[in-house]
C-alpha cells in the first residue's frame, strides 16, 4: 500500500508542473459597458435600414445594411465607407496576419455577424464590401478571419440582415444585452474544421457585456405619389397630372414650385439629439454649381425655409420630432439652369436625394435616402409623358385565371406639349414575351422559373370620333399609332409671348384572365400556383415642320 501510494504521489508530482505551464490565450473580462441609445431608420423608399448612435458612439452599433449613393469608390469626397457593425466599446486594434473570431452570447438573433468589418478604401479591405470574410460563421458569430496587411483593422463585427430585422421590430424604449467575445491570435488554426481562437496556445480574448436601447424609430414612407412638372425655357414651372403635394410659391424674391417630398413617422423615448443632421443634396454636380443656395430650399412645415448648401444648413433630430414631412422649394432659376444644362425628362429621384449625417460617428454616420414622392420634370416645348392614372410609379394588379375572371386593367394618361399638336404619337408595351401560333403573348413566370404562362394583352383608347380602338399588344415591343386618340387641348403662353398647347388623352392596357391559353404553360403543361411579370409602356411623339 505504501509503495502504491508513493508511486501515485510521484506520478502526480511529475504531471502537475506540465499542466500548470501549458500556454493559453489571455482572457480579459471587462466591466459591463454603459448602456447606449440608438436611432433606427426604416427606409421604405429604398428598402434598406440604418442604425446610428443616439448619444455616445462606443460601444458601437452603427451603419447601414446597404450601400447608398454616398458610397466611397476611390475618388471624390469620402462619405459612406463601411456597412454597419458592432464592437465592445474599446475599439481594439488587430495585428496583421493574425486570425480573429467574434461571437455573441445571449445574441438577440441567430447568425448576427457576417465577418470582420473594415474601412473599404483602406489597404487590405474590400472596396466593394468593406468586409473581410471569415473561414466560417455559425449562429453566434464568425471565426478565422485573417487580418490583412495595410490599413488599420479593429475588433469590429459586421451586422447581418437578421440583426437589422431584429432592431426593426424592437419597440421604442426596449433594450437588449449581449456578451461580445473578441479573440485574436497569431496561431494559424483552421476555423472551418472547428478550431477556435479561444482554444489556441496564445492570443488575446476579450469579453464584455453591452446593452443597447432603441431610443427612436424613423420610418421613411414611400407614398409612390407621382406628379408631372413642365418647364419652359425661362424655367417657369407648370404642374401637369399627378397627386404629389405641390403648389406654386414665392419665397422672398424667388418664385417657383414647392412640393412635399418626404413623408415620415418618428417615434422616440424622449431622446434629445442634435448631432443627427438631415438635408437635401443635388446629385448633378454641374447643376449644383450653377444654382444659388436659395434656388433650392427645404422646410419641415412648408412655411419656414432653409437654403440648400452642402452641410451648412440642416434640420436636427430634435427639430424633426415636431414634424412628419419635408418640403422642397425649386425656384424658376433652378429649372432654368436645368434647361441651360440640357437636363430634361428627369425623375427627381435621379436629381437629388436627402443625406443623413451623424457627426458623432464619422466613419459610419453617413446615409442617403430617396424622396417619398416623385416629380417627372419635362420641358414644355416638345415633350411627351405617360403616367399611371393612379399617379404612382409602379401600378400593380393581381387576379385569378379562369372562366369569368376579370381582366387586369391599367389606366394611363398620355400628355404632349409643344407649339402645336404632335404630328404623330406612338405607344408600345415591353416585357417578357413569346410568340405562340403567330401571336405574341406576355409571359408570366413562377418564382422558380419553372412555370411560364402566356397571357394575351391589349392597348385601347377612345378616338376622335368616339369609337374605341384596340390593339393586340402582347408585350411585343412594337409601336402602335395613337395619333387619332381623343385629345383634350389646353393652350399655354410662354413668358416670351410664344403660344403652344398641352394635349392629354387616356389609354388602357388590359390583360385578360379568362383566355383558355393561360390555363396551360408555354410548354403546354398544366400549372398551379402563382406567376408574375413586370413590363413597361413607352410613348413617343413627333413634330414636323416646326420653325
UniProtKB/Swiss-Prot annotation:
Localisation: Fimbrium
Signal peptide (UniProt feature, chain positions): 1-20
GO cellular component terms, A-Z: pilus
Keywords of the record: Fimbrium, Signal
Domain of life the protein comes from: Bacteria
Keyword set includes Signal: yes
Induction: Negatively regulated by H-NS. Positively regulated by IHF and EcpR.
The family this protein is said to belong to: Belongs to the EcpD/MatE family.
Role, per record: Part of the ecpRABCDE operon, which encodes the E.coli common pilus (ECP). ECP is found in both commensal and pathogenic strains and plays a dual role in early-stage biofilm development and host cell recognition. Tip pilus adhesin, which is required for assembly of EcpA into fibers.
Assembly: Forms polymers. Interacts with EcpA.
Name recorded for this polypeptide: Fimbria adhesin EcpD
Organism: Escherichia coli O6:H1 (strain CFT073 / ATCC 700928 / UPEC)
Record lineage: Bacteria, Pseudomonadati, Pseudomonadota, Gammaproteobacteria, Enterobacterales
Amino acid at each position: 500500500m505504501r509503495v502504491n501510494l508513493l508511486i501515485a504521489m510521484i506520478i502526480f508530482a511529475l504531471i502537475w508542473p506540465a499542466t500548470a505551464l501549458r500556454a493559453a490565450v489571455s482572457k480579459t473580462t471587462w466591466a459591463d459597458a454603459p448602456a447606449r441609445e440608438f436611432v433606427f431608420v426604416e427606409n421604405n423608399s429604398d428598402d434598406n435600414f440604418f442604425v446610428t448612435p443616439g448619444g455616445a458612439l462606443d460601444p458601437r452599433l452603427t451603419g447601414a445594411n446597404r450601400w447608398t449613393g454616398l458610397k466611397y469608390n476611390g475618388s471624390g469626397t469620402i462619405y459612406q465607407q463601411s456597412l454597419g457593425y458592432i464592437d465592445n466599446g474599446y475599439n481594439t486594434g488587430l495585428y496583421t496576419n493574425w486570425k480573429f473570431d467574434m461571437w455573441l452570447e445571449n445574441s438577440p438573433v441567430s447568425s448576427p455577424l457576417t465577418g470582420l468589418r473594415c474601412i473599404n478604401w483602406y489597404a487590405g479591405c474590400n472596396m466593394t464590401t468593406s468586409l473581410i470574410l471569415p473561414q466560417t460563421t455559425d449562429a453566434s458569430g464568425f471565426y478565422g478571419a485573417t487580418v490583412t496587411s495595410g490599413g488599420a483593422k479593429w475588433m469590429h463585427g459586421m451586422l447581418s440582415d437578421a440583426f437589422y430585422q431584429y432592431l426593426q421590430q424592437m419597440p421604442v424604449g426596449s433594450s437588449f444585452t449581449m456578451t461580445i467575445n473578441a479573440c485574436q491570435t497569431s496561431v494559424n488554426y483552421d476555423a472551418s474544421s472547428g478550431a477556435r481562437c479561444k482554444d489556441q496556445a496564445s492570443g488575446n480574448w476579450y469579453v464584455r457585456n453591452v446593452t443597447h436601447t432603441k431610443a427612436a424609430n424613423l420610418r421613411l414612407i414611400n407614398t409612390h405619389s407621382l406628379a408631372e412638372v413642365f418647364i419652359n425655357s425661362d424655367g417657369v414651372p407648370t404642374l401637369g397630372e399627378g397627386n404629389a403635394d405641390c403648389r406654386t410659391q414665392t419665397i422672398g424674391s424667388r418664385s417657383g414650385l414647392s412640393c412635399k417630398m418626404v413623408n415620415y413617422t418618428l417615434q422616440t423615448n424622449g431622446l434629445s439629439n442634435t448631432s443627427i443632421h438631415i438635408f437635401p443634396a443635388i446629385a448633378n454636380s454641374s447643376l449644383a454649381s450653377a444654382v444659388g443656395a436659395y434656388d433650392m430650399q427645404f422646410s419641415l412645415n412648408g412655411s419656414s425655409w432653409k437654403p440648400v448648401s452642402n452641410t451648412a444648413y440642416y434640420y436636427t433630430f430634435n427639430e424633426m420630432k415636431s414634424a412628419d414631412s419635408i418640403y422642397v422649394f425649386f425656384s424658376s432659376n433652378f429649372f432654368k439652369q436645368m434647361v441651360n444644362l440640357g437636363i430634361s425628362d428627369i425623375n427627381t429621384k435621379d436629381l437629388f436625394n436627402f443625406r443623413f449625417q451623424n457627426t458623432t460617428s464619422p466613419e459610419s454616420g453617413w446615409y442617403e435616402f430617396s424622396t417619398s414622392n416623385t416629380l417627372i420634370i419635362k420641358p414644355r416645348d416638345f415633350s411627351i409623358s405617360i403616367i399611371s392614372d393612379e399617379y404612382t410609379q409602379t401600378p400593380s394588379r393581381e387576379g385569378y385565371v379562369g372562366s369569368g375572371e376579370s381582366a387586369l386593367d391599367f389606366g394611363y394618361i398620355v400628355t404632349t406639349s409643344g407649339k402645336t399638336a404632335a404630328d404623330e404619337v406612338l405607344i408600345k408595351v415591353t416585357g417578357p414575351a413569346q410568340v405562340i401560333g403567330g401571336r405574341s403573348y406576355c409571359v408570366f413566370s413562377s418564382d422558380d422559373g419553372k412555370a411560364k404562362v402566356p397571357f394575351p394583352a391589349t392597348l385601347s383608347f377612345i378616338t376622335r370620333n368616339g369609337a374605341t380602338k384596340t390593339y393586340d399588344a402582347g408585350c411585343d415591343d412594337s409601336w402602335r399609332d395613337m395619333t387619332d386618340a381623343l385629345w383634350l387641348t389646353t393652350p399655354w403662353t410662354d413668358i416670351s409671348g410664344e403660344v403652344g398647347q398641352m394635349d392629354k388623352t387616356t389609354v388602357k392596357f388590359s390583360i385578360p384572365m379568362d383566355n383558355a391559353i393561360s390555363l396551360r404553360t408555354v410548354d403546354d403543361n398544366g400549372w398551379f400556383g402563382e406567376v408574375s411579370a413586370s413590363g413597361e409602356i413607352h410613348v413617343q411623339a413627333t413634330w414636323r415642320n416646326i420653325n
